[in-house]
């Protein structure tokens, strides 16, 4: 994930290069176009891909994602596939202070979204809006395996009450998808593209 901080720097966290998952942090100074790798401390998130990150003030908030290790791969190839997938999908929230580069854990009450990756999160006032993603649970309309599916969940995280709740809306909602993009403009959430697994 990549986020603009203060208009002059871009912070990159985590990702996957096709072989390895990462949880490192890099900073690009946009004024001199120079990369640096700051020394971070605190309880850092585990390596992951497909996570979301948003900036709230000077805090970088990271949610969800997906990771796989050798042990999970062995399980997924056998009778423990379901439990292996359960361990791979993430739902934690970590916060990085972009001034001190110290990680901390964040706990939010209410009914949190299912573990997922490929979703989007956007800031709208004091609310964080979450939509879609690829998850291991039931309830979505499109599946390619019994334990995995894209979804059309719309969740709201209130930073005032530090709690999750399911979003309510009228009209025709977007279809289930992951890998899409979204942005909040005023009272509107714009969603574009994505993948249902059956089609883009």
Would you name each region that the model predicts?
Residues 1-200:
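Kelch-like beta-propeller repeat domains
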């Amino acid at each position: 994930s990549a986020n603009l901080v203060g208009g002059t720097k871009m912070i990159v966290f985590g990702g996957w290069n096709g072989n390895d998952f990462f949880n490192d942090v890099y900073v690009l100074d946009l004024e001199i176009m120079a990369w640096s790798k700051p020394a971070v401390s605190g309880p850092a998130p585990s390596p992951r891909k497909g996570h979301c990150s948003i900036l709230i003030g000077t805090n970088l908030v990271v949610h969800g994602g997906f990771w796989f290790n050798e042990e999970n791969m062995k399980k997924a190839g056998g009778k423990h596939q379901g439990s292996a997938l359960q361990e791979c999908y993430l739902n934690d929230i970590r916060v990085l202070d972009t001034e001190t580069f110290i990680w901390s854990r964040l706990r939010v009450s209410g009914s949190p979204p299912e573990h997922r990756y490929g979703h989007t999160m956007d800031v709208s006032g004091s609310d964080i809006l979450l939509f879609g993603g690829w998850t291991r649970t039931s309830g979505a309309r499109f599946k390619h395996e019994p334990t995995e599916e894209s979804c059309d969940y719309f969740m709201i995280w209130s930073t005032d009450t530090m709690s999750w709740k399911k979003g309510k809306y009228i009209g025709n909602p977007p279809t289930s998808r992951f890998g899409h993009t979204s942005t909040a403009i005023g009272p509107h959430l714009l969603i574009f593209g994505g993948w249902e697994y059956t089609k883009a």
